[in-house]
Amino acid sequence: MHIPAIAAVSLFALAAASSAQAQPAAKALQVKIGTASPLSGTGAHQGKDIENGARMAIDDLNAKGIVLGGRKLQWVLQPEDDAADPKTGAAVAQKLVDAKVAAVVGHLNSGTTVPASKIYANAGIPQISPAATTPLYTNQGFKTAFRVVANDNLVGRTLATYAIGTLKAKKIAVIDDRTAFGQGLADEFAKGVKKAGSGAAVVSRQFTNDKATDFNAILTQIRARDPDVIFYGGMDAVAGPMLKQMKALGLRAKLVSGDGVCSEKMPLLAGDALGDDKVYCVVAGGVGPAQEAGLNAFNARYQQRYKMPVQTYAPYAYDAVMVFAKAMQAANSSDPAKYLPALAAVKHEGVTGSIAFDPKGDLRNAALTLYTFRKGQKVKLQVLR
């Protein structure tokens, strides 16, 4: 039977359309991001903060409908509990490697971050820590190790300068919890005091541990030296009870510390011993007026979603996920081997500030934000550079 040309063309077009409709849409490409942080123990509130921040980023990325290599991406979060323990951290790292994650946001504690970083490096999986500050982490020479916070060198030096220059401290006591984070930070602070050469000096150096609850022995020794400032290298779970015992012993010294103490939980942990302008602490990152609105909006979204305020690290975890996504888009691939060069060269304006990495994986031009506590609230004082 003869079919007119126009009819034949129409039938062909209809058949082609039917065939196209019959073809299933390309399956979404799953990109799995792991988080590793303490979800149990005394640091669980900080570790959950990291997971929550990363999850917000994952949801935002899925809402964008990002396409790589012609396939829509499905972003998936795999959170793991490292219990702030080096051995558990190493086991978690291997679990994430075996799960074939494309990237890892973690760990929180320096003591878990360093051993885990070797496992990620051997597997070629990029890692961005939203919290670990020990210089050792990025001094190992691993091309997969990055962080979006300042390291102890900057934090310790900056806090020493502030304690001497602004708080006018002459006699300073130093305590650390013997963890990689706490000891490293305290050592750098002590070096900063010595380097200042302004007549200020460390008059007492004491040690505790990250699970301690009784500090009377070391605080009694410190009280005998009548310091102006006590520097503590460690986390809020220890700093809170320590402040209570400082008050009970009549210690008038101000407490200075790093980001581990700069949490929203400190008022609960320290009670009325927190006082006003008694505690000074810094967190990594520093946003100017132009970026302040973005950070405030993130904090408000977090509060609305989780019915609690940001502790410390959620914005850094959020930025870490977004930095990974930006590098993958630049490389048009979620394969770690392909996007790693783009990650090393990334430039990103995040909620915590400008992010770019130096050859070691540290932040370029890192800034710190100084806080104190007044009437049970954390109050921003200034950005330090």
Protein language model features and the residues they cover:
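Periplasmic-binding protein-like
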Residues: 96-108, 128-130, 171-176, 226-235, ...
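Short, low-complexity disordered leader/linker segments with a strong preference
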Residues: 1-32, 98, 385
